[in-house]
Amino acid sequence: MRKRQKMKNLTVCILVSILAAGCTNEFNAVYKSDNYEYKYEFAKQCFARGKYTQSAALLGELVTIYKGTDNAEESLYMYAMSLYRSSDFEAASDAFRKCCTSYPKGTYTESAYFYVAESLYESSPEPRLDQSPTLAAIKAYQDF
């Protein structure tokens, strides 16, 4: 009985490992691809599935390529949000600021202003350290 349970656990572990390796291989293939539309769609899928690190890696490259196109605003906002959700708050605040300045009347501008403040707040250090990021977060909340 006990041996049977161990075999079952081992089988489950092997299947999970194979699936994880398959997903990683797919990401690597997409990342190396020159098909930007496919990369963009895959990045959106990663974002929807909560794979924000992969989404940020793909969108970071696509933001400059899509500048001036119909997908530019959405790709920049999704890139910033991917950084935020993967806890890279300093880079996220910069990306959200870029979103605000590049598209001042855009679809995501109001939300981007809010997330500038949130990113700065999240990156604030503990009270005994330099509070420049905290003051910047307070100002960003006031601007929002």
What are these regions (language model features)?
Residues 2-4, 19-144:
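Acidic, polar-rich low-complexity tracts and alpha-helical solenoid repeat scaffolds
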Residues 12-20:
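Bacterial N-terminal signal peptides
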